[in-house]
């Protein structure tokens, strides 16, 4: 069976966008634990992405209610965004610990 028969292309694109959004949200969570505030440039530096790419992503996250941005460009997670970010962070932490337990680097 071909992949296109299982998932329409539009659904694959949506899945990729969701994964990307989750990664951005998790990165914002991690940065907010290290720094008093998070800016787009901090996210770009952390992920080694271009500033324009991050700006587009932040616009989408803001429009979908996952983040808040003040007049100075400081980014905070909304309650919905924080819930997703914490879930992703916990999953990644648990997976990393499990792989380390198994002896995988």
Language-model region placement:
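Long, low-complexity, charge-rich intrinsically disordered regions
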Residues: 1-6
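N-terminal helix-turn-helix DNA-binding core of bacterial DNA-binding proteins
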Residues: 8-49
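Alpha-helical hairpin
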Residues: 17, 77, 104-105
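Residue-level recognition of specific faces of alpha-helices
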Residues: 27, 57-60, 66, 80, ...
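N-terminal intrinsically disordered, low-complexity, charge/repeat-rich segments that act as generic
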Residues: 39, 87-91, 98
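Canonical helix-turn-helix DNA-binding module
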Residues: 40-71
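Basic, amphipathic "hinge/linker" alpha-helix immediately C-terminal to the N-terminal HTH DNA-binding motif
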Residues: 73-91
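Amphipathic alpha-helical dimerization/coiled-coil segments
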Residues: 93-105
């Amino acid at each position: 069976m071909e992949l296109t028969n299982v998932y329409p292309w539009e659904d694959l694109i949506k899945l990729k966008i969701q994964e990307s959004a989750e990664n951005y949200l998790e990165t914002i969570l991690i940065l907010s634990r290290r720094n008093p505030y998070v800016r787009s440039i901090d996210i770009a530096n952390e992920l080694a992405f271009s500033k324009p790419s991050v700006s587009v992503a932040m616009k989408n996250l803001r429009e979908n209610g996952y983040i808040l941005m003040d007049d100075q460009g400081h980014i905070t997670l909304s309650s919905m965004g924080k819930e997703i970010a914490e879930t992703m962070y916990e999953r990644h932490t648990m997976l990393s610990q499990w792989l380390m337990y198994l002896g995988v680097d």
